[in-house]
Amino acid sequence: MRIHEFGTEHEKTVLLLHSACLSWRMFQPAAERLQTQYHLIIPALPAHDPDEKTPYTSVEAIAAELGDWLEQRGISALWGLYGVSMGGAVALRLLADGKVAVRTCVLDAAITPYRAPRWLTRGFSLRNYLVIRFAQRHLALIRRAFPAQRFGQAAVEDDCMILGRMDRRDVWRVFDSCFHYPLPKRLQTAARVSYWYGSKEYFQRALDIRHVRRLLPETAFVAFPDCAHAEFVAGQPEAFAARLAETLELDGSDI
């Protein structure tokens, strides 16, 4: 897993974890601003590296590898941890592992594991697998479903490029792992956690919101008006960078 760093001269370290079917490049527009204030660490997660073919492993394996990498680099604490969608699942698993202290964590439409019998939830994995496999064969539909004026041209093309590179095993592992990775019933962390989501995806995220509320009762939930899944970070990078920096700089009295 290759890891990209920006703003290494800064003391405050922020780890950014990208969505499924997009690459680390989704953060490049926002990173132009954020790197003036933070040391940014942006991994290219397995099966999503535009420059290197790597197989997808699992949410928990990725979190463990990142935790080990941070320890080896002597990074014992993160000023901020941000993950969107699949990246949010990895962020949750990092919190559960507890290898690195986190001051502030933002879970943006983070996927949480299903709390239902495995035979049923595997059906949900299959449904999402088939949707993505269909999209891989009809990339024009991706451009139609995610218009560049809302999600940004670069993000839409990045999505199509990553989908074109992923094989069927990677697609299956991504969704099966995101829906079934292990988490404790109650997560103990000193991090201040926010869960972001777009108002247009509320019903898709309702179970995730409920799960996070049980896991982390002190979580602040923030809805972004007129936004779909990952639209705020992908389509409004300047506003996203400003809002993330604002969230990371809150002190205890602001929470």
PLM features per residue range, with description:
Residues 116-118, 135-187:
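Conserved alpha/beta-hydrolase catalytic His-Asp/Glu region
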Residues 224-238:
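Catalytic histidine-centered segment of alpha/beta-hydrolase-like enzymes
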Residues 5-52:
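Conserved HGGG/HGGXW glycine-rich cap/lid loop of the alpha/beta-hydrolase fold
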